A protein has these predicted regions:
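Proline-centered loop/turn at the N-terminus of a beta-strand
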Residues: 114-116, 197
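Asp-based, Mg2+/Mn2+-dependent phosphohydrolase catalytic module
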Residues: 2-17, 122-123, 127-211
Length: 211
């Protein structure tokens, strides 16, 4: 999508980032294969490239707790599978964050941009591999962002306008002065409809290619 953005982003004050596929590297196939090895044969029906289904979506929306999610996942698995095994195969979705992206986020803040996250994610990944990935430089996520909104605490997922509205209200965003980065075209369209400047980050790219 055409954002009108230049390398120095003169008309942009705030930057709103998706995580997976934009900052955090993800590999759906790692997760699918790991679940299949554990015995969840039809896992691909629940995990999409840009959204989840069934109890996985419910976890992402905060409608079920991690404990309730694991209990429902166990219905698809052989007896004896532990909580740790379930979490480990699910977390295989996340492969890490290249250090240059973390460094770029700190540089953007040092240059005066406010940086924010709006992410469709779940508490299992968030409190596990995602926050660990942000600790790679010995800092925590607050070193990189001025604020975070996750779908599981918002109770809704992109492209629902409610999660964008929550970001606007919580952080005092002016959509016309905010550039939104996402790997989902549907999410970019939803943000553009609310007045945000948008950049679609295609597969095998990152936000670094657009700043």
């Amino acid at each position: 999508m055409d954002s009108g953005i230049t390398p120095h982003m003169p008309m942009t004050r705030d930057l709103l980032f998706d995580l997976g596929g934009v900052i955090v590297d993800i590999r759906r196939e790692n997760c699918v294969e790991a679940f299949r090895r554990l015995g969840f044969a039809d896992i691909a029906d629940y995990l999409g490239d840009y959204g989840q289904r069934g109890v996985f979506l419910a976890l992402e929306q905060g409608a079920v707790s991690p404990e309730q999610w694991r209990a429902q996942v166990r219905r698809h698995l052989p007896a004896g599978v532990t909580d740790g095994q379930i979490d480990d195969v699910f977390n295989a979705f996340i492969t890490g964050i290249p250090l240059e992206r973390l460094q770029a986020l700190r540089r953007l803040r040092a240059e005066g941009y406010r940086t924010f996250v709006i992410s469709n994610t779940n508490p299992v990944m968030w409190h596990g591999p995602i926050l660990r990935a942000f600790a790679a430089e010995g800092r925590d996520i607050n070193a990189y962002f001025d604020g975070v909104v996750t779908s599981f605490e918002a109770g809704c997922c992109k492209p629902d306008e409610r999660i964008f509205r929550l970001c606007i209200e919580r952080f005092g965003l002016d959509p016309a002065a905010t550039t939104f980065f996402d790997d989902s075209e549907a999410n970019c369209r939803a943000a553009a409809a609310m007045g945000f400047r948008t950049i679609h980050v295609p597969p095998s790219s990152s936000f670094l290619d657009f700043i």
